[in-house]
């Protein structure tokens, strides 16, 4: 502040310079009564040098001790603090605190309750309980249907499967008339009978395809057959004939040999 600057500048005028307590404090921690210092019980003031009447007051009139520097809040000085008289204006920390803790009366009744009725996870679990899927089928109802992951699957009885298998071995493709008769006798719908025949044909194709693959693998893993005996005999005959021909001497070569001998 400006007054503090003058005091620091004119150190020669004061043998025992004592700063006014309001010059080093922030406005929010300033108290009207100046503190009492044990090191400076009183000091002499030369009248007429400074127009501030507070410098002439003895130190014994100071009644309270200001809080330590660690207790000060990091707030800057407010507007007009340098020109105002410390004895006329007082500040409190609550004036410079922008966020005030709300009292119990300011909160709505829903926020005053200590424990909420339901947590967010419990609410989410209750809202989406119907979306859960179970991997294990549930119990069968009276219509002979059971619930799987995302569709209904018909559970056939042993008698129904036996009659359907008999009909499938008789004819792989059932006619419309026979389908209606079989559905009426087995207490099924025509659509259920049709779907069973479709699934049964698909199963048969899968089994036949697997058998063909196994047969092809067995044929590829068999060892190759050795060469036949006739081929080896032919090869031997050719070799013997060639060796016998090599021992024979042509008649044209005889006189040539005789000429060389003579």
UniProtKB/Swiss-Prot annotation:
Gene3D superfamilies: Homeodomain-like
GO molecular function, a single term: DNA-binding transcription factor activity, RNA polymerase II-specific
Coarse class of the protein's main subcellular location: nucleus
Ranges where the record places region Disordered: 42-120, 203-262
Region Interaction with DNA: start-end pairs: 152-173
Residue ranges with Polar residues bias: 82-95
Superkingdom: Eukaryota
A GO term from the CC aspect: nucleus
Biased composition (Basic residues): 203-212
DNA-binding stretch(es), residue numbering of this chain: 149-208
Compartment(s) where it occurs, according to its Swiss-Prot or TrEMBL record: Nucleus
A single GO BP: positive regulation of transcription by RNA polymerase II
Region listing for Interaction with 5-mCpG DNA, in residue ranges: 191-202
Protein name: Homeobox protein CDX-1
Organism: Xenopus tropicalis
